[in-house]
């Protein structure tokens, strides 16, 4: 349990699923006013091309959702209290086109809420056979400076390398913040060519649709790999929001 003051907001949308925002109040209000809020994000939705089929979403994006939950649990157990405000976001409707995060961004822009940095956790638990564990550091639709900062974090807090990769479109909720002009970054389970997309998507003509194969019992699903993202996330918020 966190020692810092926390509050939870259920951010409602026109569609049934809400976005969940956990706000952790920093001890230094002046610092928050100067910097803005530090955000860790993940999308909580999953989808299947055929609506009647299951869409378990263990990796996309149960893994990112759990990464945030475990980060929060570990920080609370350690007695962490931030100096500046931190938020944990679980977005709705990412699979529909970043709809939940875009609605949150629009709300923050409208209310003039400053954002110091945002890091997205989307697909964090798969290691392809015959490959070594790596972070896939996305270099497009992100903040170059914040991306470089993540490389420094990995060197100091992890024992696996970061490998640059491109997705060629705004592939997850970080892109909503990038479009609004706020610094955002995205690290995934591996470089694009070695991530789990081939297992959980099926190619139909020229489009990719999620299937019911995205389960935690598939070969390559790795909770130890997910734990590395938890450590990286902890480093991200502690280094940026500090430890009061």
Give the predicted meaning of each segment.
Residues 124-244:
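Active-site-adjacent substrate-binding region
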């Amino acid at each position: 349990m966190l020692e810092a003051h926390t509050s939870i907001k259920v951010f409602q949308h026109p569609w049934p699923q809400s976005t969940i925002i956990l706000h952790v109040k920093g001890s230094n209000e002046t610092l928050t006013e100067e910097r803005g809020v530090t955000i860790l994000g993940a999308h909580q939705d999953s989808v299947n091309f055929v609506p009647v089929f299951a869409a378990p979403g263990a990796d996309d994006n149960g893994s990112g959702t759990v990464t945030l939950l475990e980060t929060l649990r570990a920080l609370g157990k350690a007695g962490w209290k931030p100096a500046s405000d931190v938020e944990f976001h679980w977005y709705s409707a990412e699979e529909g086109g970043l709809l939940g995060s875009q609605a949150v961004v629009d709300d923050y822009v409208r209310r003039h809420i400053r954002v110091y940095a945002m890091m997205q956790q989307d697909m964090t638990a798969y290691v392809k056979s015959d490959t070594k564990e790596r972070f896939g550091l996305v270099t497009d639709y992100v903040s170059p400076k914040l991306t470089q900062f993540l490389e420094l974090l990995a060197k100091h807090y992890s024992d696996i390398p970061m490998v640059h990769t491109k997705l060629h479109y705004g592939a997850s909720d970080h892109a909503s913040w990038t479009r609004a002009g706020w610094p955002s970054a995205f690290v995934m389970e591996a470089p694009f060519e070695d991530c789990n997309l081939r297992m959980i998507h099926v190619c139909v003509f020229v489009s990719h649709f999620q299937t019911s194969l995205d389960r935690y019992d598939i070969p390559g699903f790795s909770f130890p790999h997910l734990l590395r993202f938890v450590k990286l996330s902890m480093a991200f918020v502690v280094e940026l929001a500090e430890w009061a």
